[in-house]
Amino acid sequence: MMELDLLTAISPIDGRYRGKAGALASYFSEFALIKYRVQVEIEYFITLCELPLPQLKTLDSSRFDSLRAIYQNFSEADAQRIKEIESVTNHDVKAVEYFIKEEFDKLGGLEEYKEFIHFGLTSQDINNTSIPLSIKEALEQVYYPLIEELIDQLNAYAEEWANIPMLAKTHGQPASPTRLGKEVMVFVYRLKRQLAMLKACPITAKFGGATGNYNAHNVAYPAYDWKAFGNKFVAEKLGLEREEYTTQISNYDNLGAIFDAMKRINTIMIDMNRDFWQYISMEYFKQKIKAGEVGSSAMPHKVNPIDFENAEGNLGVANAILEHLSNKLPISRLQRDLTDSTVLRNVGVPFGHIVIAIQSSLKGLRKLLLNETAIYEDLDNCWSVVAEAIQTILRREAYPHPYEALKALTRTNQAITETSIKEFIETLEVSEDIKKELRVITPHNYTGI
C-alpha cells in the first residue's frame, strides 16, 4: 500500500489542494475530532467537580489546569495512542475515555475520580458536542474571515467601477444599460444578506444521555437538576446551545439550516463566477498574465479564466455534499441508527471545497484588468436600448401609441444607430423642448439611479 502524502491522497482536498485547505485539518481531521472529544470529556469532568458531585468534592480545583493541559497540549502521539486503544476496543469514544484514564494515572492522585470520566454519557453526547464545536470554530476562524475578504474585494470593485456604464443583457440580449459597479454590488448585497442569515443559525448540541432523558444521571443522583446542568455546561464551557428534546442523537435540524445557508451562499458565488467568466469572454476584462504560465497544451495564445472555473466546480461539489448532509442528518430510525456517524465524518469535505473555491474566486478577481474600451464600444453599438427611455417620455406626454412606434423602429434586423434614433426623434409631433429632452438620451447616460 502506498504511503499517504500529497501525491497519494485520494481526495484532492488532502492532495493537490492541501496548500489551500490545510488549515481545516485543525477542525475536521481525525486528529481534530479526537482532540475535540478529549476537550469535551475533560470539561465535562471539571463541570461535575464544580457542581460538585459528593464523590468529587475532595478534588482540588488547583488541579483543573493540569487536566485541561491534557487537551490543550494534545499531540499526534496522543492521538496515535487513542487509535491503538481503539484497535482493541473497536470503539472510538471509549478509546478516548481509556486514554484520559491513563493520563489521570500519569498525573497521580486521581485514581478515585477516574470513573467519573464519561459518567452517565453515551458516545453521542461527546460526538454531538465535539462536531458542532468544530463547525463553530471553523466558521469563526476560517470561513467567515475568508468570505468577508471576498465581499470586501467585490465591494472595492463596486466602488471603483461605480460610474462605468455597461450594456445589460437579459436572455443574452441587449437590455437597458446599467453600471458595472452596481452589477458587482448585487453580489455584495446578496452575499451579505445570506451571510447574516448563516450567522443567525444557532449552533446546537445534543447532551442528555443514552436516549436523551438523563436516565443514568437521574438514577444515580436524583436530587440534581440535570437539564439545567446540561444547559449550563454546553453554553458556558462549549459556547453552544443544548437541544432540549432529543433521542440518542442530535436532531440535526439546526445543523441542516447551517448547511442550507452555506449552500445558498455557494449558489451566489457560482452565479458570480459565471458572470465574471462571461464578462471575460465578452472582453470586458482582460487577465493579468504571469510569466511562465501555460493556458493550453496546444494553443499558445490561451489565457483562460481558470480560477473562476475552478471555483465554480468546487462550489458545485460542496453543494452536492451539503445537500446530502442537510437532507440525511435529521432522519434517523426511532431513537437512532448509525447512518449519521459516517455521514458526519464528511462534514469537513464541503468546507474544504468552499475554502478552495473562495481562494480561487479571489485569485481570479485580483487578476482582472478592466477593458473600458470594449465596454464603451459594446454600449455605443446598441442605440436601440434608448427606445425604452423615449417611449416612456412619450407616454408621459400622452403621445399616441408610443410603444408601438418604437417597436416598429427598433424590433428589426437592421442596425439601430445614433443617427437613426435622432432622425426618428425629429419625426415626432412633439414640442421642441421634448425633442431636446429626447436628444440628450444616449446609451451611456441612460443608466438609471
Residue ranges and their predicted role:
Residues 2-30, 66, 294-449:
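Catalytic-core signal marking the mid-to-C-terminal active-site face
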Residues 2-214, 221-233, 295, 308-310, ...:
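A helix-coil-helix interface module used to build multimeric assemblies
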Residues 105-111, 199-202, 281-284, 319-323, ...:
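Proline-centered turn/helix-capping motifs that create local helix->coil transitions or kinks
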Residues 136-144, 148-151, 155, 185-188, ...:
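Short amphipathic alpha-helical segments with heptad-repeat character
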Residues 194, 241, 247-333:
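Glycine-rich anion/phosphate-binding loop at the beta-strand->alpha-helix junction
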Residues 224-248, 252:
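Active-site-adjacent "gating/activation" loops or surface patches in catalytic cores
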